[in-house]
């Protein structure tokens, strides 16, 4: 498993988005999957209870299988979108490794999980998370929306932004910003750290 830098993963996510989407947000990851990539999204009851996984992508690149019970509620839509983007991260970043294991169902995925060394699996998952974050939260749009939300925050609270610790400010901003991108606040907080540098 090659180590990929954050910059390499960011570039891969940006290239993927440019190829399959446009500059609008939120990125319609379901449309990309079903229309552009012609993959099926298959809901599997009990996937999380039986195998402790939210979703997996098959090695044939024909399906993304998702836990039905976990994602049937509308409140999980943002998490679902992130899971889709995460699985696409495996397609883009780990295609060769996935193809070697021939993952076609949850049992195959469990075998894959058992056979890949723990640190290597952790690298893959971390890389797919980073990919999903960059895919769904383009930093140029994040920068502009952050400015807009900060202006609203200043107006509403009559406060000087420079007086607030950047990490605390990110926590305040993450909720309002997340609505623009169709993700939960946590990935926004992570993405905002890139703008604090």
Can you annotate each of these PLM segments?
Residues 1-197:
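Active-site hotspot residues in diverse enzymes, especially metal/ion-binding acidic/histidine motifs
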């Amino acid at each position: 498993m090659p180590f990929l830098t954050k910059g390499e993963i960011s570039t891969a996510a940006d290239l993927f988005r440019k190829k399959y989407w446009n500059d609008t947000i939120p990125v319609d990851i379901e449309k990309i999957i079903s229309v552009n990539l012609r993959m099926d999204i298959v809901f599997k009851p009990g996937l999380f209870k039986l195998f402790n996984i939210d979703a997996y992508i098959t090695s044939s690149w024909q399906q993304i299988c998702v836990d039905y019970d976990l994602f049937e509620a509308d409140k999980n839509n943002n998490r679902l979108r992130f899971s889709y983007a995460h699985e696409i991260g495996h397609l883009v970043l780990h295609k060769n490794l996935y193809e070697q294991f021939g993952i076609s169902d949850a049992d195959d995925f469990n075998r894959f999980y058992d056979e890949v060394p723990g640190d290597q699996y952790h690298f893959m998952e971390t890389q797919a998370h980073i990919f999903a974050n960059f895919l769904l939260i383009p930093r140029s749009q994040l920068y502009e929306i952050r400015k807009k939300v900060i202006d609203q925050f200043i107006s509403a609270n009559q406060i000087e932004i420079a007086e607030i610790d950047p990490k605390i400010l990110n926590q305040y901003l993450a909720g309002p910003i997340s609505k623009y991108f169709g993700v939960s606040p946590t990935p926004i907080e992570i993405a905002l750290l890139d703008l604090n540098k």
